[in-house]
């Protein structure tokens, strides 16, 4: 089948993890601004597509996207195409997304395999339990998608490039062998400075 539940449980040790995850301070996190221009491959999270398409990606992210090898996930494709068909801008947004997807080389678009799906389920369950969020608000599904992207990147030896700071910080705490590169969009940076 390709998924070894016993090995995944041995590796993640969900039964031994207690308490609540806490986001690390910014100085302890890997930021796009601190990354060398030339480096290892990137695995793009959905936040990257949204920020680039809306013109709000920071310069450091744009530079990394220009010079680094970029891989893509079918999980993000799924997230990008969940739109309300009745919304006035949906047709235009879908055209933009379609053009973006057409630019992705087929050999750089990856689908999670059975092992990654199984591991992601265990990891997402652990993340949900340790994040202490309320049930029934969609967090579990979001965590499965984040875990899929994180584990796919790890499998490829790539770093996840993402603006989803909290969730990917948590994932990298739970699986320290996965790599992440974080950023804040300029709008998010302004909100932090004023708040």
Question: Where do the model's predicted regions map?
Answer:
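Active-site neighborhoods of divalent-metal-dependent phosphate/nucleic-acid chemistry enzymes
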Residues: 2-6, 26-28, 109-159, 163
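Phosphate- and divalent-cation-binding pockets in alpha/beta enzyme and binding domains
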Residues: 79, 119, 170-171
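Generic detector of contiguous secondary-structure segments
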Residues: 61, 96-118
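Short, well-structured N-terminal submotif of metal-dependent ribonuclease cores
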Residues: 1-99
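Short, hinge-like loop/turn segments at secondary-structure boundaries
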Residues: 87-91, 127-128, 178-180
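Short active-site oxyanion
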Residues: 39-40, 68-69, 106-108, 154-159
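Alpha-helix capping/helix-boundary segments
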Residues: 48-49, 76, 116, 149, ...
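Acidic, PIN/NYN-like endoribonuclease modules and their adjacent C-terminal/linker elements
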Residues: 1-35, 150, 154-195
